[in-house]
Design a protein with these regions (language model features):
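Transmembrane beta-strands of outer-membrane beta-barrel proteins
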Residues: 46-50, 86-88, 123, 139-143, ...
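Extracellular loop and loop/strand-boundary signature of outer-membrane beta-barrel proteins
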Residues: 58-63, 106-116, 163-170, 218-222, ...
């Protein structure tokens, strides 16, 4: 009896272990990955979604900086046979980088410490594949990449030994790519729970318009990238009414990213 009980609940046990491992990871990635299995109809069809994503990460060159973003996006996807899906997103995002304007030179003062810019457009492409082991348990994998269409720019003013200055910092060519795999369990009412690990790489170029003593960055492009390439994710997909689904997802690290999306299956 105990053996049958363990076998019956094996998918839930494995999923729980993955959730624990995911929480222990040290990085987050940009955007929802979504359920491992497409929500499109069995015979093939379109689904669309609108979503929001709150993202935090640590980027580094010689110094670590916390990065925060709020993303709003619209998605169109096509999937079939409950096993594959391709999708595209278009959205807008802000960008905040903490303590990037701190001066290490006592003769230089600045009017603020943090970089902030609002609402630049980005695009995302992704694909996923799913293998149903049985009606409850399945495994899947995905790849997803995001690129921003324009630069983020913020102005800064201050003084150097009492002499005023004005300059700006640009964050250019911000992009990321993610690849992951996971397990999915379907529980009563068609609710899908999923979790797994992923690898993640993100990069951007940072440049200051002019050289300012004491500021970390200078004229000329300097590359920054995410601090750690490994992460974990978990989420659930909840059927609502008349083709609508609610997707809630978190990506865990020393910082936390999370978001939600509402999709409609045609």
């Amino acid at each position: 009896m105990k053996r049958k009980l363990i076998i019956k609940n094996f998918p839930v046990i494995v999923l729980t272990v993955l959730l624990i491992l995911s929480i222990g990871q040290t990085v987050t990635a940009s955007g929802l990955f979504g359920p491992l299995q497409t929500v499109s109809k069995q015979d093939g069809g379109l689904n669309t979604a609108i979503g929001y994503w709150y993202h935090e990460d640590t980027y580094q060159n010689d110094t670590n900086h916390t990065v925060r973003q709020n993303e709003i996006y619209s998605q169109a996807a096509y999937g079939a046979k409950n096993i594959w899906e391709i999708y595209a997103r278009i959205g807008i995002s802000d960008l905040k980088i903490f303590d990037i304007f701190n001066s290490t030179d006592a003769s230089t003062t600045t009017n603020k410490n943090d970089f902030e810019e609002n609402w630049k457009f980005f695009g995302t492409l992704g694909a996923k594949a799913f293998y149903p082991i049985n009606k409850v348990f399945g495994v899947g994998a995905f790849i997803q990449g995001t690129s921003y269409f324009s630069n983020f720019t913020d102005d800064i003013v201050g003084t150097i030994s009492g002499t005023p200055f004005t300059t700006d910092l640009k964050v250019k060519n911000l992009w990321d790519v993610n690849f992951g795999a996971g397990l999915q369990v379907t529980i009563p009412h068609g609710i899908k729970l999923y979790a797994g690990p992923y690898i993640y790489y993100s990069e951007a170029e940072v440049s200051l318009a002019s050289n300012i003593p004491g500021l970390e960055y200078s004229a000329g492009d300097v590359s920054i990238k995410n601090k750690t390439m490994l992460g974990g994710f978990t989420g659930l997909d909840i059927p609502l009414i008349k083709g609508f689904h609610l997707n809630i997802e978190g990506q865990f690290s020393d910082r936390f990213s999370a978001g939600a999306a509402v999709s409609y299956t045609y």
